[in-house]
Amino acid sequence: MELNHLVTGKIALNQYVHRLEQKDVSFYVHYWGAMTNHYNTLLHKHSFYEICYVVRGEGYYLEGDRTYPLREQTIFLSKPEHLHQIKSETGLFLFYVAFELSEDQSSAEWIKVMEEVKQSPFITMQLKDGEPPGLLWKTLMLQAAQPVNAFDKEILSHLSHALILSLIQTFLPYAQRPKQKQPIHTSSALLTEVKLHIKDNLSQPLKLTDVASHFHISGRHLSRLFAAELGVSYSEFVQNEKINKAAELLKSTNLSIKEIAEEIGFSVHYFTRVFSAKIGSSPGLFRSLYKDSKMTAFQINKPFQKIEQAKPHE
C-alpha cells in the first residue's frame, strides 16, 4: 500500500486537533508530524512527550548511553527532559505526535498513569501487523488527508484521542496492565441484536428457526439464550412484544382492530384471543376504557412488562 500521500494529513491535524478532552482526562497536542525521509537530528530534549512511528526505513534512536535499532513498525517514546537523537543513513518514513497531559483538567488517576509512563522502562516497542496503534495512526492520517468538513473534525478528534490512549497503553509497564483479558460476553450482545430484530419486525411471522438462521445460530441455541438470560421462552417473548405493540397502538392511534392485528402479524381472531388472554380484556374494551375520561386505572389480569395503567383521556 502506497502511504506517501498520507503525509499531507499532518496539515489538517495541526490545524484542527490540539485539545483532546474526554471524561477524566485531557491532552494538549503540541504538533503532529509526518516525514517520508527523516535522517538525523541534533541531540535535544522536549518538555513534553513525543512518540514516533516508523512506517518504513531503518535507523537508530539514541537516549542516554543506549542505542535502539529502528525499523518498520517500531514505535519509540521520548520522555520529557530526556536528551535523545534520531539517526538514519537511508531515511525514515515517520509519523510523530507531541503531547502532554493537561493535569488541571484530568483526574488524579490519570496523573498517576502518566507518571507510570514516565517511569516506564520501555523506550521502543515493535508492533506486529494489525496491532491497534499502527492501524489507528494510518487510519487517522488517511482521514486527515481527505478534504475536511465540520463532521470530519469530530472524526479526527475522536480518532486522535483513541490513538493517544493506545500509544500510552503500549508504553505502560507490564505490571500496570491487566494480566488477563476480561471475558467478552458475546451471548448478551447477540441477544440484544435478536431482540431489536424482533421489535423492528413484529409484522413478520418471526419463527424461531427463521430468526435463528438469520443470525447464523441453531434454534436450540437461540432458545437457550432467551431462557438463560431473560427467563422466558422465545415464543413467549415474541408474543409479549406483539401484544405490547398492539396495546400501544390501541392507546395512541385510530387504527382499526384489523389493521393493528396486521401490524403484529396476527389474524383478527387470533389477535383478539391472545390479547384477551394476556391483558384480561378484549382489544375493543381496552381501547374504550383507555379513552374514557372518567377511568383513572385499568387493572389487567396478567400484568405485563410495558403496559401502563391507563390515564384519563385529555
UniProtKB/Swiss-Prot annotation:
Alphabetical list of InterPro entries matching this protein: AraC-bd, Homeodomain-like_sf, HTH-like, HTH_AraC, HTH_AraC-typ_CS, RmlC-like_jellyroll
Q: Where is the HTH araC/xylS-type domain?
A: 192-289
This protein's gene is called: yfiF
Highest taxon above the source species: Bacteria
Which key words are in the record?
DNA-binding, Transcription, Transcription regulation
| DNA-binding region, residues | 209-230, 257-279
Protein's name according to its UniProt entry: Uncharacterized HTH-type transcriptional regulator YfiF
Instruction: Give the GO molecular function terms.
Output: DNA-binding transcription factor activity; sequence-specific DNA binding
Please indicate if the UniProt record lists DNA-binding as a keyword.
yes
